[in-house]
Amino acid sequence: MSNLRPEGVPVNFDGSDRHFIFTIKVIDDLQYMHPATGIFKMIEEAGKDTLEGLLYLVDIVYALCDGSVTRTDIMQSLKTNTLQGGGSLQTVRSAIDLALVESMPEPTDEDIPVREDASGIIETPKFLIIAMARFGYSETEAWNLTLRKFSLLNDAYMTINGMKKAEDDYMPLSMLP
């Protein structure tokens, strides 16, 4: 999968093939639904076998499906598949975890860190403004960026404009033993 054209993580939990991907819009939607809880905390809770965890899981799937299915349908699908031994609950949780990992910047990216504030909220408006002003994306395009793609674009922009030194992909001869 290309970092600039992420496909998302394929998952089938309700009879439909879907691709889960954490775009800026998905993160913002989740933070709107749960304003006091950061995205990483929501996903951690969704992995637990508690009522609160299941509610977070339903909201996360709802946001990842962009509202194309109702929360009731998601809950019913998870309940039916789990009771029939399909292992759907764990499949969906694994897909969510993988989608988050694939959508976030590499841990070494330092220019635009994905930091949460004290409450654990990622500042999505900052990413939208930069994507529209600096990169010329429309609002719709900016909402559909992953934070990983945003980070790659920002690194390239900063390097091209001399704001950041280009990282060499090779080892100079003087560093060889």
Kindly give the residue locations of the regions a language model identified.
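Charged interaction scaffolds used for protein-protein
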Residues: 1-177
